[in-house]
Amino acid sequence: LFHCHVWVVDCICAIFYNIGSRMDPNLKQRIIEEAYRLFITKGMKQTSFCDVAVAVHKSKGAVIHYFPSKKKLIDAVVRMRFFPDSQISCEMYSLADKDWNEFLRQYRNPIERVINSFPKHLNGNLLVCYMQFVSSAHEYMDEFPQMYQQLLVREQDFLSNVAYDHKISLKDAKAFSRQALNTSIGKTFLRMFSEI
């Protein structure tokens, strides 16, 4: 009798879950968005499936349906939010070709681009949040350091190409790109220390 009762409850839960998930075709993306916000504000270690479920107004089972483990959820957040937010926008690519001075004025390094994509209502030192996110992603994802290194290499290559296209000698272009990236990252960290 007990097994029958459990089976009935499981069936009822499955029916309500399927009805609920049909009503929200964007649930997987919402889970990723809310998990990202929670990972930034609370930290990856401190964020539970229950926290994410509450944030998306669904059951823990609904979250686990899409992401059976915390590692898979973190992987999705890093690949679908963090790294896309780190990329150079199409507008910056075209601006580099059109208006060099404006490009130099508007250029933001990958750290600043990610921080600028954070939800607007976050409080506190966002650079510290960024650093904690990166540190935790490094712990949870074996391939994260390589992915992050590739991001920085692409960034420096982009800056080298932009500098070369603007008739800076190849040696100077490499030096410029390295200096531009290092300087902008350095400025980001200096701002962090001035906020402490």
Predicted features along the sequence, with ranges:
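N-terminal intrinsically disordered/low-complexity leader segments
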Residues: L1-N26
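Short, basic, alpha-helical segments at the C-terminal edge of helix-turn-helix-like DNA-binding modules
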Residues: R79-S86
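Solvent-exposed, amphipathic alpha-helical segments
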Residues: R30, E34-T41, I88, C129-F133, ...
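Amphipathic C-terminal alpha-helical segment
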Residues: R113-S117, Q132-E143, D157, N161, ...
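Amphipathic alpha-helical packing segments from all-alpha helical-bundle domains
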Residues: R105, K120, N125-V128, A137-K167, ...
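Short, charged helix-capping/linker segments at alpha-helix termini
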Residues: K45-Q46, K167-D172
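Helix-turn-helix
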Residues: R30, E34, L38-V77
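Hydrophobic alpha-helical connector segments
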Residues: A76, C90-L122, L170, K174-A180
